[in-house]
Amino acid sequence: MPTALITGASAGLGAEFARQLAAKGADLVLVARGTDALNVLAGELRTQHGVAVEVLAADLGQESDVTRVAERIADAGHPIDLLVNNAGFGLPLQFADNDIEDEVRHLRVHVEASMRLMHAGIRAMRGRGGRIINVASVAGFISRSTYSACKSWLIGFSRWANAEYSRDGVSVTAVCPGFTHTSFHARMGLSPGHEGVPGPMWLDAADVVREGLRDAARGKSVSIPSLRYKVIVALSRVLPSSLTAGVARRGRV
């Protein structure tokens, strides 16, 4: 059976990727900082789907932990067929108001860790084939502080890597959701209903993951789940940035 390694797997989109992949029969390696939620999810998936689930506790803001995850990806004896780079977090304040160390950690998790794990994944997969999904954001198409900058990098690098390594059997897809019902905003201190986001703009995590997996299977370099956000991205290319920046003001759109 194929094996998928998912970072940020304890909740939100990461957990939903795990559920949908397990339902398809994939064995899993679940990565997140804490093991309690991972162990609960792992038990659920083993029971419901009969798949093998490995739990790997790692803080992707720490270089040593990123190295451990990269080594697991590189393990030829237990190959990874699909890497889902999903780990990430938002910061509650504007750039100048955040502690600079928080901003640096934010950059490490979103960009450096994703790059290191992609490097390990591509090296392990090229020739035999494999797939990488980078969970980016619609915010990557809209100028807004470091969150958008990180996601923009991830989108651009995914596009290049997909074109470069598809000839070696490795596809790379940036999945770019808009506002999605997960615990992301709550971890930023925004309680449900107080995110400042109109109801019609919210997406369901299951729909985001379903469309992302479908687009990745088709070899697309960028996946933008839902028609409404496809329209927003199209408009962002032609409208002044001052009009589109507000769409991303809460971080993960």
Residue ranges and their predicted role:
Residues S10-A11:
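Conserved glycine-rich cofactor-binding loop
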Residues K24-L41:
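Conserved glycine-rich Rossmann-like NAD(P)H-binding loop of the short-chain dehydrogenase/reductase
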Residues N86-L91:
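Conserved NAD(P)H cofactor-binding loop of Rossmann-fold oxidoreductase domains
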Residues Q94-A96, D102-L107:
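Substrate-binding pocket helix/loop in short-chain dehydrogenase/reductase
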Residues M118, C150-W153:
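Active-site helix of classical SDR
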Residues S137:
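Residue(s) in the substrate-gating loop at a strand-loop-helix junction
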Residues A174, E195-I232:
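C-terminal helical subdomain
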